[in-house]
Amino acid sequence: MSPQTETKSSVGFKAGVKDYKLTYYTPEYETLDTDILAAFRVTPQPGVPPEEAGAAVAAESSTGTWTTVWTDGLTSLDRYKGRCYHIEPVAGEENQYICYVAYPLDLFEEGSVTNMFTSIVGNVFGFKALRALRLEDLRVPVAYIKTFQGPPHGIQVERDKLNKYGRPLLGCTIKPKLGLSAKNYGRAVYECLRGGLDFTKDDENVNSQPFMRWRDRFLFCAEAIYKAQAETGEIKGHYLNATAGTCEEMIKRAVFARELGVPIVMHDYITGGFTANTSLAHYCRDNGLLLHIHRAMHAVIDRQKNHGMHFRVLAKALRLSGGDHIHAGTVVGKLEGEREITLGFVDLLRDDFTEKDRSRGIYFTQSWVSTPGVLPVASGGIHVWHMPALTEIFGDDSVLQFGGGTLGHPWGNAPGAVANRVALEACVQARNEGRDLAREGNTIIREACKWSPELAAACEVWKEIKFEFQAMDTI
């Protein structure tokens, strides 16, 4: 063992401050299969060498502090410390580096996303030696993954519950998001489900406000679901938002949803917190409820390119914590999402195994072993003209969610749902016949308009609506 990294009591205690790189920068280290690996985008302060910056990240997110302490001699830091084992410059950026850090598995509590994040993205992000710091990706070892339950049910179980195969699922967020009474809200849910949608959704803002208390909303939405099911012969659902001010209240709402016999509830997992989310996911698995996850507040954390945490890390954390759906951007709608980056974390949500692919922002090969997959939800500023692109980009295992693109139909909610269902069925049929959705998408939609006046009206309303802004988050 190098004297530079010797930290046992035999060395003796020497008070003072020493460079982090003497202990925590170990380029000779060979990572273990049980290590949690992190890729940080590090922007050091002027005059701080990248080796010192990377070592500081490893130290402050594991066993280190700003000065030598005598209690270092009471343990083996070489067993427990994080190690910065590789540094590479970021192409096209001045004084910015990707620093790779390995963490021993014993640093983390089993089955706790909360504890994992408290260590890896805790105080280190306020460290003065760094101008900016962003966690780009994590490699979660199989040994740690197996301590988590993961999604309550997963993609295949959900399809079996709904008896729906071979196409994306269709949803709609009820608008206006705030202000409707429970009865009028339930009416909108019924009209959308009757028109052909598989799901409707509470907006993330909807909890239990004075204009619509949660219990009233749950009752009217359950009535809407059962009425639509009886009339269409299809299984329907509404994402009843169980997010609340306390975990106890959240579980109480989930219990009431189960008593009503509805298939799915919802949680805002970032604002609600990972501890609450994991608790709700466990309840949902034990009681046969699907769990829809909204990512409200994610852009506060992930939108800045140089500081924060990339959404692919939040997506991996959600797959560990538990959720059957999660919002994942659209590529083509009103919300941020560059195509290759979005498809990278969509695959991380759905697939059992993903290879390292830096062109899609994937820094590590990741195995999920037996952890169920999560359905990505495309939502935000999408309408019928986007249907071919969405079908081609996201494939069958996805939820395509049209809020304004359903409720904004000139003829009303049910015709809006009809238009979306017809557009989806036309795109799926065309794809199955071997047609190129990317090249022939508009033609396919126009052909379907000939036998669907609802779709024709929707196409006329949204024919010139585009959201063309450059993505902030690029490779």
UniProtKB/Swiss-Prot annotation:
<dbReference type="InterPro" id="IPR036422">
    <property type="entry name" value="RuBisCO_lsu_N_sf"/>
</dbReference>
<feature type="binding site" description="via carbamate group">
    <location>
        <position position="201"/>
    </location>
    <ligand>
        <name>Mg(2+)</name>
    </ligand>
</feature>
<dbReference type="GO" id="GO:0004497">
    <property type="term" value="F:monooxygenase activity"/>
</dbReference>
<dbReference type="InterPro" id="IPR020878">
    <property type="entry name" value="RuBisCo_large_chain_AS"/>
</dbReference>
<feature type="propeptide">
    <location>
        <begin position="1"/>
        <end position="2"/>
    </location>
</feature>
<keyword id="KW-0460">Magnesium</keyword>
<comment type="similarity">
    <text>Belongs to the RuBisCO large chain family. Type I subfamily.</text>
</comment>
<keyword id="KW-0601">Photorespiration</keyword>
<feature type="binding site">
    <location>
        <position position="327"/>
    </location>
    <ligand>
        <name>substrate</name>
    </ligand>
</feature>
<dbReference type="InterPro" id="IPR033966">
    <property type="entry name" value="RuBisCO"/>
</dbReference>
<feature type="binding site">
    <location>
        <position position="295"/>
    </location>
    <ligand>
        <name>substrate</name>
    </ligand>
</feature>
<keyword id="KW-0007">Acetylation</keyword>
<protein>
    <recommendedName>
        <fullName>Ribulose bisphosphate carboxylase large chain</fullName>
        <ecNumber>4.1.1.39</ecNumber>
    </recommendedName>
</protein>
<dbReference type="GO" id="GO:0009853">
    <property type="term" value="P:photorespiration"/>
</dbReference>
<keyword id="KW-0488">Methylation</keyword>
<feature type="modified residue" description="N6,N6,N6-trimethyllysine">
    <location>
        <position position="14"/>
    </location>
</feature>
<comment type="function">
    <text>RuBisCO catalyzes two reactions: the carboxylation of D-ribulose 1,5-bisphosphate, the primary event in carbon dioxide fixation, as well as the oxidative fragmentation of the pentose substrate in the photorespiration process. Both reactions occur simultaneously and in competition at the same active site.</text>
</comment>
<feature type="binding site">
    <location>
        <position position="173"/>
    </location>
    <ligand>
        <name>substrate</name>
    </ligand>
</feature>
<dbReference type="Pfam" id="PF00016">
    <property type="entry name" value="RuBisCO_large"/>
</dbReference>
<keyword id="KW-0479">Metal-binding</keyword>
<keyword id="KW-0602">Photosynthesis</keyword>
<dbReference type="InterPro" id="IPR017443">
    <property type="entry name" value="RuBisCO_lsu_fd_N"/>
</dbReference>
<dbReference type="GO" id="GO:0019253">
    <property type="term" value="P:reductive pentose-phosphate cycle"/>
</dbReference>
<keyword id="KW-0120">Carbon dioxide fixation</keyword>
<dbReference type="InterPro" id="IPR036376">
    <property type="entry name" value="RuBisCO_lsu_C_sf"/>
</dbReference>
<feature type="binding site">
    <location>
        <position position="204"/>
    </location>
    <ligand>
        <name>Mg(2+)</name>
    </ligand>
</feature>
<feature type="binding site">
    <location>
        <position position="379"/>
    </location>
    <ligand>
        <name>substrate</name>
    </ligand>
</feature>
<keyword id="KW-0150">Chloroplast</keyword>
<feature type="active site" description="Proton acceptor">
    <location>
        <position position="294"/>
    </location>
</feature>
<keyword id="KW-1015">Disulfide bond</keyword>
<dbReference type="GO" id="GO:0009507">
    <property type="term" value="C:chloroplast"/>
</dbReference>
<keyword id="KW-0934">Plastid</keyword>
<feature type="binding site">
    <location>
        <position position="203"/>
    </location>
    <ligand>
        <name>Mg(2+)</name>
    </ligand>
</feature>
<dbReference type="InterPro" id="IPR000685">
    <property type="entry name" value="RuBisCO_lsu_C"/>
</dbReference>
<dbReference type="Pfam" id="PF02788">
    <property type="entry name" value="RuBisCO_large_N"/>
</dbReference>
<keyword id="KW-0113">Calvin cycle</keyword>
<keyword id="KW-0456">Lyase</keyword>
<comment type="subunit">
    <text>Heterohexadecamer of 8 large chains and 8 small chains; disulfide-linked. The disulfide link is formed within the large subunit homodimers.</text>
</comment>
<keyword id="KW-0503">Monooxygenase</keyword>
<dbReference type="InterPro" id="IPR020888">
    <property type="entry name" value="RuBisCO_lsuI"/>
</dbReference>
<dbReference type="GO" id="GO:0000287">
    <property type="term" value="F:magnesium ion binding"/>
</dbReference>
<dbReference type="GO" id="GO:0016984">
    <property type="term" value="F:ribulose-bisphosphate carboxylase activity"/>
</dbReference>
